[in-house]
Amino acid sequence: MEIITPREQIRKFFFEKHLEFLTSVPQQRLQEIILSSCMKGHSGKMSDYGECGPAHRTTYGHFLAKGKWDDKRLEETQKRESFQTVSELSRRDGTPLFISIDDTVLPKTVPSSKAKRPTQGAGWHYSHLEGKVVYGHQVHAAIVGTGDTSLCYSLKRCCPENGTKIDMTLEILRSLPNQTGAYILMDSWYTNPSVLDACQEKGCHLIGAMKTNRILFPEGKRTSASDLAASLDPGCFHPVTVKGRTYMVYRYEGPLNKIDHAVVLLSYPAAAMGRKCALRVFLCSDSTLSDETILEYYSHRWTIEVLFRAHKRYMGLKSFMVRAAKALDRLLLVVALAHFFFSCGLGHIVPFHIGLHLCRTAFVNS
């Protein structure tokens, strides 16, 4: 049986995914960076690329910070090809198409007041993971998935040039093909009327967590979700089991503040029924879905948290060392492209971490 090396695989991948518009040198550098990132101990430093690739570390640093290559077109192509790959799987298998949107913080060391070349674009951001404000870069991400397959659709730095996180979310939605019927999954920070309107304009459905103080209008009476939950008799809730866990759920369907009509689920873990701190609220724009299906679909949002952990662990996003903001923006694009390659570029579709380890093993054995 013919054995195809990782270098041959990635050249084939670039051709099949229509990345041949890049000239030979940018293609070569991108391929070297992607393949270097699969090696054990990779930390996202230019010295890692220099040790694994044929060029010096400064060559890769210059390529990311100042190299002349069409990163905008590469981003558009990577988005289109990733979406098309998952969309075709969804149609073939008859499984729903999900797009999860979230953000994370990449912590960095606070620079000294005397630092002459501090890292560009870093600032203070609230980290949900650490539960406090930390110094670093905030990254906005979107993944597209169906079944057991998920690909990185977008990975961009939060900065004034890109607008607010809501602006970046709206830009993601505008970039999607029309009438895909996808379910857009997000946490309570992103669930708002403008995002819902953008989803509906694209023929998509929104399933998002909501803050418990959001205003509902049961029987025309203005009240918050938390107050409504507290006023209901326990008998109004019914059990819903999702992935082995049981929740007590009340379904509200009607208007919200600035939203004409949607489904809202008030949910408690069965063991914490009635506890105010345990209340979770979810909004769904697709009224045809059952309560169980809404919660099951929303559980797919966890995939983006797994992606953040994998990129920090394997792709060096936790320890990268580039100073220029442009270099980081391009590095994030390369990480998204690498995710695509390790998931789909080795002859068959596999989870990202499995593809990365397969590529690593092939290098060791070659």
Language model: regions and residue ranges:
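Contiguous, well-ordered alpha-helical segments that form the cores/surfaces of helical PPI scaffolds
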Residues: 32-37, 140-143, 335
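Single, function-defining residue in the core of a domain
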Residues: 1-18, 94, 112, 146-366
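Gly/serine-rich nucleotide phosphate-binding loop at the start of the catalytic core
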Residues: 1-73
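A common structural microfeature
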Residues: 43-46, 57, 95-100, 139, ...
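Structural motif
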Residues: 22-30, 128-134, 322-332
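Short N-terminal helix-initiation segments at or just after the protein's N-terminus
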Residues: 32-47, 80-83, 123-132, 225-229, ...
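Active-site-proximal, Lys/Arg-enriched surface segment
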Residues: 65-147, 246-250
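Hydrophobic, Leu/Ile/Phe/Ala-enriched alpha-helical segments that form helix-helix packing faces
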Residues: 37-38, 85-90, 173-177
